Regions:
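Conserved beta-strands of PAS-like sensory domains
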Residues: 47-84, 152-172
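Short hydrophobic alpha-helical segments used for membrane anchoring or interfacial signaling
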Residues: 8-10, 93-96, 100-108
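A short, hydrophobic secondary-structure junction motif
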Residues: 44-62, 69, 100-115, 136-142
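Solvent-exposed loop and beta-edge segments used for protein-protein assembly and interaction
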Residues: 43-45, 63, 95, 149
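Extracytoplasmic/periplasmic sensor domains and loops in membrane signaling proteins
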Residues: 1-42, 74-90, 111-150, 161
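Glycine-centered flexibility motif
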Residues: 6, 47, 70, 99, ...
Length: 172
């Protein structure tokens, strides 16, 4: 009888039921990344979705239905760009923008404004092994120096948990 919001990993088979475009957005090639833990897969095909459900009641407060919706976070830059704008306000240091934001699905960058050596969003790159161990394995926030794609940064990472409390990713 209450509204529920959660972040969940959605299998490709479920994304396909909603539309080919969602499954295509979720599919990411994994890019070899310096200092990342070994990973045998060369791609990710499941998606991370922010989902919500709210009861619909009649005049007698009886639940007669549910409003349900979700937003696929893979390749969706609205959240990371908005957070960057709010927190870092376009500040620069030595001509370079400071502050970056990433949503990780497990250890994989699925939404980010971190850029690679070509100046493109570093989608498909991975987190460093030491951050992986702290945040994804031990479930602890990380605050400190970390290697991000191709540079050292002062960073903060927080686990993203699904509705059951399982760690499914990170916010950087």
């Amino acid at each position: 009888r209450e509204t529920v919001i959660a972040t969940e990993i959605i299998p490709r088979s479920e994304l396909l039921k909603e539309g080919q475009n969602l499954a295509e957005r979720a599919y990411l090639r994994i890019i070899p990344t310096p200092k990342a833990a070994p990973r045998p897969e060369d791609h990710e095909e499941n998606g991370m979705m922010l989902k919500g459900a709210a009861p619909v009641t009649d005049e007698q407060a009886r639940v007669v239905g549910v409003l349900y919706g979700g937003i696929l976070l893979n390749l969706n830059y609205d959240i990371v760009d908005r957070v960057k704008d709010i927190v870092f306000k376009g500040e620069r240091y030595k001509g370079k923008e400071i502050g970056t934001v990433t949503i990780f699905q497990n250890d994989l960058r699925i939404s980010t404004n971190v850029t690679d050596e070509k100046g493109q969003r570093a989608i498909g790159t991975r987190v460093s092994e030491e951050v992986y161990d702290a945040v994804l394995v031990r479930g602890k926030p990380w605050v400190g120096r970390a290697f991000v794609v191709n540079h050292w940064y002062i960073t903060a990472y927080e686990p993203i948990r699904n509705i059951s409390g399982k760690i499914i990713g990170m916010l950087y």
